[in-house]
Amino acid sequence: MRVCRKTIVSSMASSPHILFLFMGASNLARGYSLLTRHISSCFGKNKTEFLNALGPGRGFCARGGMFNFTYPPIQDCRILEVAKKKSCDIRVVLITDIGNDLMYGVLADTLIESLDGLIGRALQWDAEIFLTSIHVNLKKDVSPTMFFILKSFFYPGSSITYEEADMFIIKVNGYLEEKARQNERVYLISGMKSFTGMDKIHYSFLKTHSAWEKIANEICHVLKVPVQKKMRLADGISSIIANLYRLIFCDMFRFKKKGREYF
C-alpha cells in the first residue's frame, strides 16, 4: 500500500468532514450497514457522511437487479452530482462488485469506459479512490457447467459465453491494475477471493465480516486512522439481515422509502 500523502494526515488532525461514496452490487448491499458502522466508529470525532449506489445485480453502465425490481446504472444515478455539491474536506470513493455489466452483455471496453468516467470525475475532487478487482478466475474457479448454472439463475437471458466472460474479466482487471499504477490516489484492494462462498461470486455468510474488515482497514490505513475494533461474525449477520429488510420492504414491496443516502 502506498504511503498516505501529508495533506490527509494534517487534515485529519483538524477533525474534518469526510464524505464516503460506496458503489457496488450485492456484496456491498449485504455489508453496507456493517461497513458504515465500523468506519464511523474508527473515525470517532470526525464527521462522517455516506452516500451509496448499491443493490443485488446492479451494474455500472447497464440497468440490473433481481426479481421484480431493477436499479438504474450507477453511472446515471446522480450520486456523483450530489457528492460534488456536498461541502466536505475529504472524499473517499469505493468502487466494488464490478462484473454484473459483463453478464448483462456489456462489452469489456464499454464497462472500462464507464469506470474510467467515474474514477476520472472523482479524481477531479482529489478523492481517495479504492477499487476491488473481479475476484473470479473463471478457468480456475468455475467450470463451464457451473458457469451455465450460475448464468441461468442470476442472469437469465444472458448470451455471454464462458470464453467471452473469461476474456472480459482479464481485460477489466488489467485496466484496474493499470489505473492504480498510474494514479497515486487510486488503490486496488486485492485478496478478496479468499472470502467468497461456493458460487465464487458472493462473500460467504461466515466471512462477510472479514471481507469488509479488510476493505475498511485498507481505507483507514490510507487515511492514517487507527482501527478501533475488529468486526465480528454477529456484525456480519446483522448487516445481512438489514439488507434483507431493505430488499423486502423497500425494493420489492415498497412499503418504506430508503434513506436519502441511497441512489
Model segments located where?
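Conserved catalytic region of serine esterases and O-acyltransferases that act on ester linkages
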Residues: 2, 15-19, 200-201, 205-263
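Flexible, charged surface loops at secondary-structure boundaries
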Residues: 12-16, 84-89, 123-124
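Conserved SGNH/GDSL esterase-like catalytic core that processes O-acyl groups on lipids
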Residues: 19-109
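Hydrophobic anchor at the start of a short beta-strand
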Residues: 48, 127-129, 186-187
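Active-site segments of SGNH/GDSL-like serine hydrolases
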Residues: 95-103, 121-165, 192-195
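Charged helix-capping and loop-helix junction motifs
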Residues: 108-117
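Acidic carboxylate-rich catalytic motifs and surrounding loops in phosphoryl-/glycosyl-chemistry enzymes
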Residues: 133-136, 186-201, 230-233
